[in-house]
């Protein structure tokens, strides 16, 4: 009985020490919005609760396509919606987006790749944007 317990303990240690290491192969896929909040001097807005959506697909060839929708966030209180088209790259655990034709926070902040998740947290001109996307 003792050899089995020792084997299980060793397996648990190995499993716990095997941290996720982002690669192109394991971050490629389709991501959808889990969390999206902006915080400024007037408070925090939860865009998921307001009906906001975001999707983004990372292809193995470094291209990306997606969609961002924020109800009431456009000019004059109109809805804001845009297609996210461009390229993506991975360096360490950081994903960056190159979307020359699309001026959004998506291209302007670094994204952290963890297992089945992309997270961004950055402050622009006093407004903090926190986004989590999951596969």
Q: PLM features: what roles do these ranges have?
A:
Residues 28-62, 97-106, 130-131:
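Short, solvent-exposed loop/hinge segments that bridge or flank secondary-structure elements
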Residues 17-32:
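N-terminal helix-cap/turn-to-beta initiation motif at the start of protein domains
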Residues 1-15:
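Sec-dependent bacterial lipoprotein signal peptides
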Residues 3, 26-27, 94, 117:
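N-terminal cationic leader/targeting segments used for protein routing and processing
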Residues 45-94, 124:
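N-terminal glycine/threonine-rich, aromatic-flanked beta-hairpin/loop signature
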Residues 94-135:
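Beta-sheet ligand-binding and adhesion/scaffold domains
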Residues 37-40, 68-74, 99-101, 122-124:
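Short acidic, glycine-rich loop/turn motifs
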